[in-house]
Curated annotation (Swiss-Prot):
Its EC number is 1.2.1.70. NADP(+) binds at G191, A192, G193, A194, M195, A196. The keyword Oxidoreductase applies. The lineage of its organism: Bacteria, Bacillati, Actinomycetota, Actinomycetes, Mycobacteriales. Homodimer. It comes from Corynebacterium diphtheriae (strain ATCC 700971 / NCTC 13129 / Biotype gravis). GO terms for biological process: protoporphyrinogen IX biosynthetic process from glutamate. This is Glutamyl-tRNA reductase. It holds the Pfam family Shikimate_DH. NCBIfam families: hemA (TIGR01035), PRK00045.1-3 (NF000744).
Length: 438
């Protein structure tokens, strides 16, 4: 079994296609269950963010595994298979492990160095674990990747490149406004989740005068407004249905609801409003593109941010060095684990031969007393253990090194061993019942 990544991101696909593949918790749970139901896939988890959709799986067959993932994504989204193949990228084995480490470190993000992705990978892992589709292989890779991400953010200055999508969006909005802060401005924040909370916090740091929070659950909107007040920013909460009533009173709108319908369209904006900056942090999009056609209205969304971000931005060398170190440690440990069953089989084979030969000796020399036989038995086992010790230690050391030699296969061929296949970690019959899709 080797790790496989099949995905698309802001680097490979248009936002409109990413929208079609975005998943809420229920869809993600159903999809990982569908993935491990395929014979070629043993474990699976899905990272779904505003600019990324990636399937991580353990597969016994590269080509079949890729095809199975694409078919499941097609069934989930309704997107044509050929269209999917045109935008999906694939990573396999060590390259897949390296990709997850780079993603978790923020090196593959639209804003290099952003930290939100660590939490998003952790959430994807917990979601798949609860769904019963994560086994020891993905568990080990995720833990190694999270450790790598923590090291990168702790030991390098990569955070200076960009704290998050929120800060990047606000910086782009300020650039369009020819301003350095939001002093004297009033804002409407739609949503009360993690992204909306980050937006409210960042607006406060940039000098916003007042924040109005609207959310479909009023209590959550009130909590976010209370947090803003505690942080020293004037804020209030309103019912979500009243969001249009305050449009004429604000200078900035930030929407992060992740709804399936637009929260604001051009028809909702008062004709004589004046300048209005709109920031859409959601995928699928919250704010209709047609708002940008209204005089005085400016729109910053995920697609705009992708165009602004430099896809050729140089990666932090210190961060890349850490990723390389952690990848080598992870892959070395993996190769040692891969050869362990063959080593264990060799020792069992040797023990079986000893038992067989001692039984023959006992039959051929029945006059040997029990003490002498026990001494012969101990001596033979010591000799065999000493003969096997150096080769088994050395084969693990050699296996830890990268290369094209399969030492576990070599041991099996040299000694005629039959190594049992590693059991599948995920039992499809024990998965939770499907969740109703949105």
């Amino acid at each position: 079994m080797s790790v496989l990544v099949v995905g698309m991101s802001h680097r490979s696909a248009p936002v409109a296609l990413l929208e079609k593949l975005s998943m809420d918790d229920g869809v993600r749970t159903n999809t990982v269950s569908d993935l491990v139901a395929r014979p070629s896939l043993a474990e699976a988890m899905i990272v779904s963010t505003c600019n990324r959709l990636e399937v991580y799986a353990m597969t016994s067959s590269f080509h079949t595994g890729v095809n199975d993932v694409v078919e499941v994504l097609h069934d989930m989204s309704g997107v044509d298979m050929e269209e999917l193949r045109g935008y999906l990228y694939v990573r396999y084995a060590d390259a897949a492990a390296e990709h997850m480490m780079e993603v978790t470190s923020g090196l593959d993000s639209m804003v290099v160095g952003e930290q939100q992705i660590i939490g998003q990978v952790r959430t994807a892992y917990h979601s798949a674990t609860e769904a019963g589709t994560v086994g020891p292989a993905l568990h080990g890779l995720v833990q190694a990747s999270l450790h790598t991400g923590k090291r990168v953010h702790t030991e390098t200055d990569i955070d200076d490149a960009g704290a998050s999508m929120v800060s990047f969006a606000c910086d782009e909005a300020l650039a369009q406004m020819s301003a350095t802060n939001f002093a004297g401005c009033r804002a409407l924040v739609l949503g009360a989740g993690a992204m909306a909370s980050l937006a409210a916090t960042h607006l406060g740091r940039l000098g916003i005068e007042h924040i109005t929070v609207a959310n479909r659950t009023f209590e959550r909107a009130q909590r976010l407004a209370d947090h803003a007040v505690e942080a020293g920013v004037a804020a209030s909460a309103i019912e979500f249905e009243r969001r249009m009533d305050v449009l004429c009173d604000v200078d900035v709108v930030v929407s992060a609801t992740g709804a399936n319908t637009f929260t604001i369209e051009a028809a909702n904006i008062p004709a004589a409003h004046g300048d209005l900056m709109m920031i859409d942090l959601s995928l699928p999009r919250d704010i209709s593109d047609d708002v940008a056609e209204v005089p005085g209205v400016h729109l910053v969304n995920i697609e705009k941010l992708r165009d602004v971000a430099s896809s050729g931005e140089a990666k932090d060398h210190a961060a890349q060095r850490i990723v390389a170190e952690e990848l080598e440690a992870y892959t070395s440990a993996q190769r040692i684990r891969d050869v362990a069953p063959a080593v264990a089989a060799l020792r069992r084979h040797a023990s079986s031969l000893i038992d067989s030969e001692l039984a023959r000796l006992s039959t051929r020399v029945p006059s040997m007393d029990e003490d002498d036989f026990s001494e012969v038995q101990r001596t033979v086992r010591r000799v065999v253990d000493k003969l096997l010790h150096q080769p088994t230690v050395r084969v693990k050391e050699l296996a830890a090194q990268s290369g094209t030699v399969s030492y576990d296969t070599a041991i099996q061929e040299l000694f005629g061993l039959a190594v049992e296949a590693t059991p599948v970690a995920v039992n499809v019959d024990e998965l939770p019942e499907r969740i109703n899709k949105r």
